[in-house]
Amino acid sequence: MARYIFITGGVVSSLGKGLASAALGALLQARGYKVRLRKLDPYLNLDPGTMSPYQHGEVFVTDDGAETDLDLGHYERFTGRPATKADNITTGRIYQDILTKERRGDYLGATIQVVPHVTNAIKDFVLSGNDEYDFVLVEIGGTVGDIEGLPFFEAIRQLGNELPRHHAIYIHLTLLPYIPSAGELKTKPTQHSVKELRSIGIQPDILLCRTDREIPKEERRKLGLFCNVRESAVIEARDVDNIYAVPEAYHAAGLDDEVLAAFGIEPRIPPALASWHTINERVRNPEGDVTIAIVGKYTGMKDAYKSLIEALSHGGIANKVRVKLDWIESEVFENEDPAPFLEHVNGILVPGGFGQRGAEGKIRAAQFARERDVPYFGICFGMQMAVIEAARNLVGITEANSTEFGPTKEPLVGLMTEWLRGNELEKRSQSGDLGGTMRLGAYPATLKRGSRVSEVYGGATEISERHRHRYEVNTAYKDRLEQHGLKFSGLSPDGVLPEIVEYEDHPWFIGVQFHPELKSRPFEPHPLFASFIQAAMVQSRLV
């Protein structure tokens, strides 16, 4: 039977519960255990698919087409286990399911209440599908004390009593702020956070304390005394120089040993952390630097590009170089010459996005890369803008544009109205809902034999990648674009949807309709990112 680890947060938000959960999952996995990670999000949205990147950050898409929290990206990158739609749920989804059942009459006229109906639905979700796992780590979004989180805290409190003894523990992630004027770490915020947690019936077994310095023994003793935990269970989670150092740091602090002790388990083998050590050695001792310009729409909120940042880092790890990022708001290029901003970079990446704002700036970035032979990587929207640039400046279709921005005489990019998912036909219309209506999840693509992208994938002609888009490049323009050098080197298996474009006579210019960053791992860098960084190294004359 699976054992459950519930991870909560206190004092402030954005402490890194998702990263802490992922790192602990990696440590348990390194000890030979089978691990599953799940996320409970208290917000009322059905999913984050329609939420602003500035509020929520990245939407992480799974193979089965779920739009989920970015923490699931951490889970995948640290454990290598693909997440599914069954690993993330929101209050909105729970309420939708309950109200659907109520309308059907499933509750036989009962009064629907938070307790027991909402809490039971949460418990059913947490306990479902875990037979093959040794440990299930469940992260509760938000911080203790949030009104919207109360049903989730009540549900995990009940589970602590309902599961067999030694089958559930609670880890509370908290902050120990350092006050320079006092010259000491302050424990009072953590004491109050734990007091709040205990007031709703949850006694943490382990305190995971975020700090920028060593926790003095006296402060550990005080935390143990006033928070009612063993002193050994006060774990120092000190800041590290890169996120892939977290598993080793947590192991050195004794987190995994303390978790096993809380379950009454004698450690059977030490964790196999050699691969994590190798990654950190490469991160800390690079053989050179490359600079990549990210020309995006949401550069003020780096979390909007979380998987992208990590995938570029993985490309650097694969090539033993440090990847420096130069963030450029794409709107700047609508009024400024791109050259002063881009002449010093070794590669240009134009990521996904939605809407007209900043689109012309992305088109100009693609033009600069094409004309100056700078490696260019266009992802989703970035591929579409590269195609529009080619149509305007190579083919001479001056009015080339996307119907996403409004009516146009030359729709190089248009709304997808139907496509195949397996054997089922998906259909969409211009007037349809925004939420959950995109082409989402893993889809196959057929690569042109002998193309650059086929070589990048090791000679493969069939691949599967994750998508999140509503618009597509119009194949009616395919022949004219190819006559001017822009090759369609990847298509959907039925030949209807363009998946990849490239210039054969360019050092490295590839646009993809999918999101390869979602499948990159530190141990297995995505081949497109590894190849892109390698091309940037050539550009920088490192090789």
Swiss-Prot record:
Cited Gene3D superfamilies: 3.40.50.880, P-loop containing nucleotide triphosphate hydrolases (3.40.50.300)
One Gene Ontology cellular component: cytosol
Inhibition and activation profile: Allosterically activated by GTP, when glutamine is the substrate; GTP has no effect on the reaction when ammonia is the substrate. The allosteric effector GTP functions by stabilizing the protein conformation that binds the tetrahedral intermediate(s) formed during glutamine hydrolysis. Inhibited by the product CTP, via allosteric rather than competitive inhibition.
Listed Pfam families: CTP_synth_N, GATase
Annotated positions binding L-glutamine: Y54, G353, F381, G382, M383, Q384, E404, R470
SUPFAM superfamilies, per database record: Class I glutamine amidotransferase-like, P-loop containing nucleoside triphosphate hydrolases
Keywords: ATP-binding, Glutamine amidotransferase, Ligase, Magnesium, Metal-binding, Nucleotide-binding, Pyrimidine biosynthesis
Gene Ontology MF term list: ATP binding; CTP synthase activity; glutaminase activity; identical protein binding; metal ion binding
Ranges for domain Glutamine amidotransferase type-1: 291-542
InterPro entries in alphabetical order: Class_I_gatase-like (IPR029062), CTP_synthase (IPR004468), CTP_synthase_N (IPR017456), GATASE (IPR017926), GATase1_CTP_Synthase (IPR033828), P-loop_NTPase (IPR027417)
EC number, UniProt record: 6.3.4.2
Pathway given in the UniProt record: Pyrimidine metabolism; CTP biosynthesis via de novo pathway; CTP from UDP: step 2/2
GO biological process: 'de novo' CTP biosynthetic process; pyrimidine nucleobase biosynthetic process
Residues annotated to bind CTP: S13, D146, I147, E148, K186, T187, K188, P189, T190, Q191, K222
Enzyme class: ligase
Chain positions covered by the region annotation Amidoligase domain: 1-265
Binding positions for UTP per the UniProt entry: S13, K186, T187, K188, P189, T190, Q191, K222
Residue positions binding Mg(2+): D71, E139
Catalytic activity: UTP + L-glutamine + ATP + H2O = CTP + L-glutamate + ADP + phosphate + 2 H(+); L-glutamine + H2O = L-glutamate + NH4(+); UTP + NH4(+) + ATP = CTP + ADP + phosphate + 2 H(+)
Binding site for ATP: S14, L15, G16, K17, G18, L19, D71, R238, D239, V240
Quaternary structure and partners: Homotetramer.
Note: CTPSs have evolved a hybrid strategy for distinguishing between UTP and CTP. The overlapping regions of the product feedback inhibitory and substrate sites recognize a common feature in both compounds, the triphosphate moiety. To differentiate isosteric substrate and product pyrimidine rings, an additional pocket far from the expected kinase/ligase catalytic site, specifically recognizes the cytosine and ribose portions of the product inhibitor.
Function text: Catalyzes the ATP-dependent amination of UTP to CTP with either L-glutamine or ammonia as the source of nitrogen. Regulates intracellular CTP levels through interactions with the four ribonucleotide triphosphates.
Family: Belongs to the CTP synthase family.
Protein name stated in the entry: CTP synthase
